[in-house]
């Protein structure tokens, strides 16, 4: 018996729940990129955008690899200039959301 599909909001809530176990992670009350964002050291590393896609900050080469593999797209905030270190991940690739959010957490936490 198959389960009904999970909504992007429900999937992101699971990511949030898993990552909030890290004492350095908080969920912003502000709206970052269209929805409540996960932050570390006051910096956004993951959020759910207004299209229901996971938005994560990763190294440029990792974003390039996700784009090349068809698993992600560069995030364009609407100015026609995609951001080098931000990728969006479709809801159909939901099994990647938590691992990529963890990668984003580690990447942003390592930056000073």
Predicted regions and their residues:
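Charge-dense, helix-prone N-terminal extensions
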Residues: 1-112
């Amino acid at each position: 018996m198959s389960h009904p599909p999970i909504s992007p909001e429900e999937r992101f809530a699971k990511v949030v729940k898993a990552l909030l176990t890290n004492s350095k992670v908080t969920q912003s009350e502000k709206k970052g990129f269209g929805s409540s964002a996960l932050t570390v050291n006051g910096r956004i590393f993951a959020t759910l955008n207004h299209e229901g896609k996971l938005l994560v900050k990763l190294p440029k080469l990792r974003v390039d690899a996700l784009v090349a593999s068809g698993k992600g797209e560069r995030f364009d905030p609407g100015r026609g200039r995609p951001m080098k270190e931000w990728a969006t991940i479709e809801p159909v690739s939901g099994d990647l959301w938590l691992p990529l959010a963890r990668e984003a957490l580690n990447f942003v936490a390592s930056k000073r």
